[in-house]
Amino acid sequence: MKSWFISFALFFFSFAHAACFEEAAQRYQIPVELLKAISTVESNGNAGAINTNKNGSVDYGHMQINDWWLPKLEPYGITKDKLVEPCINTNVGAWILAQSIATHGFTWKAIGAYNASTGYKRLIYARKVERVLEKINSEAVALKVLGSYPKAVL
């Protein structure tokens, strides 16, 4: 069942919000596949996702931006209501990840820190992202290979 959700999310990304992911990836120098993988892990790409955590904090949008970030986003005019706008959410998620990469380098630790503050939880999260990335990359390679064959063969 989980594989179906990942496939649906990847299909959804290919049409909706593709430009948002491309723009954020370029702006923050982060692979677009990584941003899509994080969105898939966070919410299965659900732009309207709003979740309350055990500690009472709230996560918004497909990148699940925690309300802890709101005071830092306020000077840029970004409110919790704007965080459910897919392109804004994508860019804020990329901005947060870019800060994590600046702190930890382009490592799995940085990717894990997008979601978790402790080492073990970072590792668990990074592994989830890695699994989705593998799926994205294998599907991309498959599409490339299929696209190289003459249509009569397909």
Residue ranges and their predicted role:
Residues 1-4:
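Positively charged n-region of N-terminal signal peptides that target proteins for export
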Residues 6-8:
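Sec-dependent N-terminal signal peptides
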Residues 11-16:
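N-terminal signal peptide c-region/cleavage motif recognized by signal peptidases
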Residues 19-154:
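Catalytic glycan-binding domains that act on GlcNAc-containing polysaccharides
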